[in-house]
């Protein structure tokens, strides 16, 4: 299949996707909003006054939902390599999470406060090389887990997108070392053919 044909196929699938259509109807920023809503409905992670950090946040599908749960007295920091239009109550950092400069900016905003929940929908820019792309994905996941391990409150929680493949089982073992409860969850709003699932980790051991 030519590149042009594959692009047309993706556009058709995207524009006819139920969750894309629903997101447009409801004014959500992306279909990803439904994933975090499913996670919240099932696990009740977000509560008023919580401090949450959203990694890989653009275009804001998760942040726009989470801020509703934590309220005006909560705190939400969102970070992404791409631009993100402002969301009321959300502090945004644009930068590469794997760079020291961006990490320092995030730490400055965190300001030594303990975080209640770290959420990550990060994914690498895909090269088309499955082995390389999977390795990059696991690297970002490890960075997100390291950040959570350093900054979470005792009994805090961690949510991250994982692509099933080389290194994913080993990654889950690392998560289990830090949290008492670790669950694999695939939202209904995930595309059926996608290898993604979400790790829902609660009761951080501290």
Swiss-Prot record:
It is found in: Cytoplasm. GO terms for molecular function: rRNA (uridine-2'-O-)-methyltransferase activity. GO terms for cellular component: cytoplasm. The keyword Transferase applies. It catalyses: uridine(2552) in 23S rRNA + S-adenosyl-L-methionine = 2'-O-methyluridine(2552) in 23S rRNA + S-adenosyl-L-homocysteine + H(+). It comes from the Bacteria. InterPro entries: RNA_methyltr_RlmE (IPR050082), RNA_MeTrfase_FtsJ_dom (IPR002877), rRNA-MeTfrase_E (IPR015507), SAM-dependent_MTases_sf (IPR029063). Its EC number is 2.1.1.166. This is Ribosomal RNA large subunit methyltransferase E. It comes from Francisella tularensis subsp. novicida (strain U112). The gene is rlmE.
């Amino acid at each position: 299949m030519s590149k042009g044909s594959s692009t047309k196929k993706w556009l058709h699938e995207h524009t006819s996707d139920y969750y894309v259509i629903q997101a447009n109807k409801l004014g959500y920023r992306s279909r990803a909003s439904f994933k975090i809503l499913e996670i919240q409905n099932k696990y009740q992670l977000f509560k008023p006054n919580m401090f949450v950090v959203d990694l890989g946040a653009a275009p804001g599908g998760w942040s726009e939902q989470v801020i509703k749960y934590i309220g005006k007295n909560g705190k939400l920091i969102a970070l992404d390599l791409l631009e993100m239009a402002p969301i009321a109550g959300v502090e945004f950092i644009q930068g590469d999470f794997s760079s020291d400069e961006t990490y320092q900016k995030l730490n400055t905003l965190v300001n030594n406060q303990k975080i209640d929940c770290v959420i990550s929908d990060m994914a690498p820019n895909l090269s088309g090389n499955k082995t390389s792309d999977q390795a990059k994905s696991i690297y970002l996941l490890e960075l997100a887990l390291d950040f959570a391990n350093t900054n979470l409150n005792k009994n805090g929680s961690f949510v991250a997108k994982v692509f099933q493949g080389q290194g994913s089982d080993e990654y889950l073992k690392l998560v289990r070392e830090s949290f008492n409860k670790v669950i694999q969850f695939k939202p209904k709003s995930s595309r059926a053919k996608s290898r993604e699932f979400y790790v829902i980790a609660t009761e951080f051991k501290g």
